[in-house]
Amino acid sequence: MAENLRLEVVTPEKTVVSDDAQIVMAPGVLGEFGVLVNHTPFLTSLMPGALHYKDTGEKEHLLFVSDGFAEVLPDRITVLVESAERKEDIDLQRAEAARERAEKRLESGEDVDFVRAKAALTRAIQRIRVAGA
């Protein structure tokens, strides 16, 4: 029986994380969920937010993940998302600028795709939260 989970965080461009983990916490659409080894299999949607995991050396890791999906199996969790960034790779100034652009777009009310603007705002806010954690 495996003692750890294999965690894969994959975007269309690259594999961001491929590591063994003791525990993974992810931002599900119904709330944050945690996964340990031998978890019951399930598939769920993810919302933009923080993905935390503890590796086999007890080191904690933090990433921003965007919308996507997570497949949980007893010995692995695969996270498929549009984008993912490790905390240390987030450009805080760029995230702040994205938040300001999204807020201005929502406030203007002119020819605004509110769903897209709100999604952009949510992503920017979550990136800022992860960068500041």
UniProtKB/Swiss-Prot annotation:
GO molecular function, one term: proton-transporting ATP synthase activity, rotational mechanism
Membrane topology summary: Peripheral membrane protein
Keywords: ATP synthesis, Cell inner membrane, Cell membrane, CF(1), Hydrogen ion transport, Ion transport, Membrane, Transport
A Pfam family that the UniProt record links to this protein: ATP-synt_DE_N
Compartment(s): Cell inner membrane
Source domain of life: Bacteria
Function: Produces ATP from ADP in the presence of a proton gradient across the membrane.
Quaternary organization: F-type ATPases have 2 components, CF(1) - the catalytic core - and CF(0) - the membrane proton channel. CF(1) has five subunits: alpha(3), beta(3), gamma(1), delta(1), epsilon(1). CF(0) has three main subunits: a, b and c.
PANTHER family, per the entry: ATP SYNTHASE DELTA/EPSILON CHAIN, ATP SYNTHASE EPSILON CHAIN, CHLOROPLASTIC
Name of the featured protein: ATP synthase epsilon chain
Originating organism: Desulfosudis oleivorans (strain DSM 6200 / JCM 39069 / Hxd3)
Gene that encodes it: atpC
